[in-house]
Amino acid sequence: FLPIYSKLKTQNGEVLAFIYFKKVLYRVVFSLFILMIIFQITMPFIIHFLAPGFLNNQNVVEQTTTLSRITIIFMPLISIVAILGVATNVSGKFWVLAFTPTILNTSIIIGCFFINDYWTIKSLPLAIATVFGGLIQIMFILIMIKKFQIFEFNDLETKNYFKKENKLIKFEINQTWKKFLPAAFGGGILQINLLVDTILASLLGFGSISYLYFADR
């Protein structure tokens, strides 16, 4: 996505690159929200598969399902952050995307102060803080995009370009998906390894998945 967007911006102008950027963003966000809804519905089955060691404690299964349904909302949010970050990086504002993890970490740290016996699930504030962190990250990048005037076009400009360059935009979008699949497959290999680790860790003592996560970090 980044090389194609950068190429269009350099060779075909900012307006055409913006149209391509917007179309890819909309399609990715739509796909991820559909996927998130599917995960929300099927989360109990996913937890049974990912953490078979929890099945002997129904309370843990229910709490894990609740927390997972909240934190899965972060998936489309961080994807939006990554795509918006492409625009800031190509414009030379590398620090903007690099700063966003600080926002998430700060949100989670603040969430730690709300952990107490009031909550049925004590780690619930952390799950909520993760989602809030993602939302704040998006707002931060959008503010920076506005501040640095990365996308400053009127509707007439974009409509005229879209009519003239519709075939080129479609071609580049198709190229994006073709290049996305091999990259997703490569990343999927790592995720399979983490998946197996999680399944095995769930069969060990309480907190093993957390220990594995922190060790990996």
Show the residue positions of the predicted features.
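Membrane-embedded alpha-helical bundles of multi-pass transporters/translocases
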Residues: 1-217
